[in-house]
């Protein structure tokens, strides 16, 4: 099992990825995401199923957003050069209000640096509400 140092590194990448996305810092975000063609990032919107390049392009076009993503708690697991994490966070609005969000991600170590190769965010819906 990987030590706390590696977990701290992975958590730092997760936090810095969200900070870059929240700030609209496309260059910084690009440095955190894997450029593998099979990298995928799935958002809460039904149409958000993107490559790393598409995510960076969207952030560059939008700049900072009034909706911010915050990672509150994460469990991080590491096996060699692969790490995965699941946790809870929230989306907050500049004008007030927030929604809980569930997040997962997979990171791989590329050239000694942890990079996000997969991410997913979802807002939970009670099973009874799926089909009403």
Placement of each model-derived feature along the sequence:
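Flexible loop/coil segments at beta-strand boundaries within sensory signal-transduction domains
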Residues: 79, 94, 109-113
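Short, well-ordered beta-strand segments in beta-rich or mixed alpha/beta enzyme
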Residues: 17, 29, 33, 41-43, ...
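Hydrophobic/aromatic beta-strand elements that line small-molecule binding cavities or substrate pockets
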Residues: 17, 55, 59, 71-76, ...
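A solvent-exposed, acidic/Ser-Thr-rich amphipathic alpha-helical stretch
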Residues: 26-78
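Short beta-strand edge/turn micro-motifs at domain boundaries
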Residues: 84-86, 100-130
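Residue-level preference for beta-strand/loop junctions
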Residues: 67-68, 81-83, 99
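Short, cysteine-centered beta-strand-loop-beta hairpins and adjacent loop/turn segments enriched
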Residues: 64, 91-98
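Short, low-complexity N-terminal intrinsically disordered segments enriched in polar/charged residues
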Residues: 1-35, 128-130
């Amino acid at each position: 099992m990987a030590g706390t140092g590696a977990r701290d590194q992975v958590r730092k990448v997760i936090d810095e990825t969200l900070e870059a996305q929240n700030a609209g810092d496309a260059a910084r975000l690009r440095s955190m995401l894997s450029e593998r063609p099979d990298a995928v990032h799935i958002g809460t919107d039904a149409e958000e199923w993107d490559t790393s390049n598409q995510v960076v392009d969207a952030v560059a076009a939008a700049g900072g957003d009034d909706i911010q993503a915050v990672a509150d708690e994460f469990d991080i697991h590491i096996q060699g050069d692969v790490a995965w994490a699941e946790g809870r966070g929230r989306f907050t609005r500049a004008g007030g209000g927030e929604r809980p969000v569930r997040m997962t991600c997979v990171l791989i170590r590329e050239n000694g640096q942890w990079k996000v190769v997969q991410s997913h965010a979802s807002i939970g819906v009670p099973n009874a509400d799926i089909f009403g």
